[in-house]
């Protein structure tokens, strides 16, 4: 009797249809609809209906469609649950993240995503096993044709309607843009992924082309105040976890006592490295919507006859295909601790100090710009402690390690300051982090990852300290990293025709926008994700 019930359950079309609907629902979530599934209910039903009809029609057609949806969804699943639909930020991370960073990403993923993945895999296997007992019925061709045509109409109605309404004869027709408007989410997801990927590759090609082109800078005058300028670009340091900005644990003792200028609120341009540094280190035009790929901090300093150096602990991925390394190779001299890419070792930022000493010791009559690009607090945090246990304690081991990495960066800045002092020449240092992070998980699984939704993903420390500073100055008005290129020129004493002559270090009140992987949005519209403290 039990075997008879089991056989009936396996062969029951209603059971199979329900399993396919659940599979469709989970696939939509994996592809990034997050909490927007209510608006995609028809799409969820449509995918379930398509798979059910395909199995009735042909086992081979079903397996092709089913396996394709599964592979697509499983491949995007972690990013889909964390970040939503495909964006330029997600695509950039795929291209510009090395192997160790990828491992760090998977280690930081919360347990809930692994549980979701387990049940999704389990459902996939169950459906594969059940469908083996199903028989195809090719005699119902009219019914199948009706279903396919209805689903095709559902998929194409909105794209066609949008194209009909298009009144711009100059607009180029693009297939990916056309299907992106589809109400059938798997189609719009795939189309958007292709479009965003092409956008990223176009940007990368423009950046590579810019290496051989003449910059558009038009320098009016150059009056350097210091002999040595050092720009330190940090990684993933949240402002509110530093004692510089009031965090109770002493994570940045050097920064909280050194004389200099501190922005009370400095807002990064983007929530992860590639989009943030593109909009920080390059000149932007058209209300920060476009980048001038030939015009960056290195090309500006070189035209102003500074001797330029780039010291990086971020490494190269492939043939100089990260945002930062493209700028770095334009310097007069560049040094990368990680010569390889995906299998590079985990090297401490202190490896940059000896090359720094060597550069400062030579050509002492030259005015120098030296950029240090740190690995800083990049995930996974504990990997940066060289096997030692964290000295700080905060809720989870990962968060404790994160605080330790902040202290490491603070100690490095203290050493940089001492090295510059020992040279006996005037100097000025700027430190900022490329972006912040947002919390993920809870309790002992608490960690942090990139997230575009929260203010703290953009709130980073910014401090300038120089050899002639005698006091600490707190700048109360907020400043945007979009304006950094203007402040960089001011810092180096460069006047240039494209750049604002307003005082970057004493900004007027302004509306600050950030790039959230899709568009520029008001920083104030973002959600809060306050720092954690020990109970």
Each model region followed by its residue ranges:
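Metal-dependent active-site segment of extracytoplasmic phospho-/sulfohydrolases and closely related
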Residues: 230-231, 408-447, 489
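A long, amphipathic alpha-helix that forms part
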Residues: 47-48, 214-218, 354-361, 391-429
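Histidine-centered active-site/metal-ligand motif
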Residues: 373, 378-379, 435, 446-449
